[in-house]
Amino acid sequence: MSRNPGMTDEAIIKMYKSGMSFKEMGPIVGLSDRAIRNVMYKHGISMNREQYSGQPRKHKVNEDYFKVWTHEMAWVLGLFVTDGHVNKQLHSIYFSQKDERILQLIAKYMEADYVLAATGPTKTTPTLIINSKEIKKDLKMLGIISNKSLSVPFPNVPEEYLASFVRGVIDGDGWVQKSGYVMNVTSGSQDIAARLLFVFQSWQLRSEITITVSPAGNYIYRIWVKGKYELPKLAEIIYNNAASDNFILHKRQRMSQRYFI
């Protein structure tokens, strides 16, 4: 096997130290387990048995995090539904977010070690790694499994925490026009789209769905909220129980700006 472009020894070592297993690293790096180990030996990097065997290194995390509903948990779940990934083979989940402050906050809420996957020429978005069999099981109970993007269901969120969950969804896959008149959420899941539309309509917001088809032939759903008065109303609902920092700053600013006009 030959290395993938950009995979220097330093990048491989950083990836290993982030907690990724040899099995996870192989397709990214383009090397076999043995070749990756040789890189570690070459640079005097100590290896534990779990990594040698291909299992992810254990990190600190509150394994009961998704068992108890709170506004913070609902927000994190909304982010995971949109920006998360469940590893099919390993007991690992990943959060990807351009705003690294959000990843730091997720790690804080989940009492998790702040371990990021290595970035490279083809992987530039910061990704938080959490290794936990229990958390993976709890997410499955909520209907969230690997390869979820086209089939993930809208979780059964208690009414009390619904606004916080929707805030997480908007922070993950939402877009807000700079002028503050238009917002949409993009999803490949018909259930997410239909249920989100129902929620917006139940909040008496002017909303609609548009559907397009991707080059791969998959449906892409966009759920819209439009109007000078609609977005401030949405902002009032979803930020009511937010802390001072658990949201994407520019999205809140854009949605809320019409309050002051």
Question: Which residues does each predicted region cover?
Answer:
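Internal intein/HINT superfamily modules and their associated LAGLIDADG
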Residues: 1-261
